[in-house]
């Protein structure tokens, strides 16, 4: 599939997560079945995000190209496509704002032990589910925050924990609950190193 003829182009250069996926979803929702949207993005996590979004929405990702630091995606509207509503994206964006504020509060509060270990998830929904399940169990040693760019530049969340022993304990507990945990990273200076599994 060398040449793909797009019906519409959406240049989202300069916008960061989650806006490229939100605007792509809203544009696709208004397109007709079979039409092709060309999306241009400079967000470093856009390629992985758009693959995931296409799979979830039922649209067809025809091809992805890299050119001059930009990711260019060609997406075909499928008949069975089901893009999330604008209300869904508003709730998603407000979650991001809430998590960034939470992260900032942890950083500036001198009375809180700073997290040293970070548990990653296969999806944001798994992270929010993990937080809810841990709250039910009375677990207060893990805080859901945005994933550091050094671990993954895409939109995502991590559970921030102080201490590797506690992080492993929570990781195993979540795994036993069938929550899609991926790994534990340890912060070492400005770097993050995968330490488990």
UniProtKB/Swiss-Prot annotation:
It comes from the Bacteria. The active site is at residue 17. InterPro entries: Se/S_carrier-like, TusA-like, TusA-like_sf. Pfam families: Se_S_carrier, TusA. Belongs to the sulfur carrier protein TusA family. This is Putative sulfur carrier protein aq_1421. It comes from Aquifex aeolicus (strain VF5).
């Amino acid at each position: 599939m060398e040449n793909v003829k797009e019906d519409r182009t959406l240049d989202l250069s300069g916008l960061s997560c989650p806006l490229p996926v939100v605007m792509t979803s809203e544009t696709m929702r208004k397109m007709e079945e079979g039409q092709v949207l060309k999306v241009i993005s400079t967000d470093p996590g856009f390629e992985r995000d758009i693959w995931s979004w296409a799979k979830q929405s039922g649209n067809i990702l025809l091809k992805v190209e890299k050119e001059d630091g930009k990711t260019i995606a060609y997406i075909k509207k499928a008949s069975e496509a089901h893009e999330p509503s604008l209300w869904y994206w508003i709730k998603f964006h407000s979650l991001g704002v809430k998590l960034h504020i939470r992260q900032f509060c942890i950083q500036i509060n001198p009375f809180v032990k700073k997290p040293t270990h970070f548990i990653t998830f296969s999806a944001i929904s798994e992270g929010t589910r993990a937080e809810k399940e841990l709250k039910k169990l009375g677990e207060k040693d893990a805080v859901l925050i945005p994933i550091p760019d050094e671990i993954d530049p895409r939109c995502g969340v991590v559970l921030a924990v102080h201490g590797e022993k506690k992080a492993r304990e929570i990781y195993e507990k979540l795994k036993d609950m069938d929550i899609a945990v991926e790994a534990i990273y340890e912060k070492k200076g400005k770097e993050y190193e995968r330490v488990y599994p």
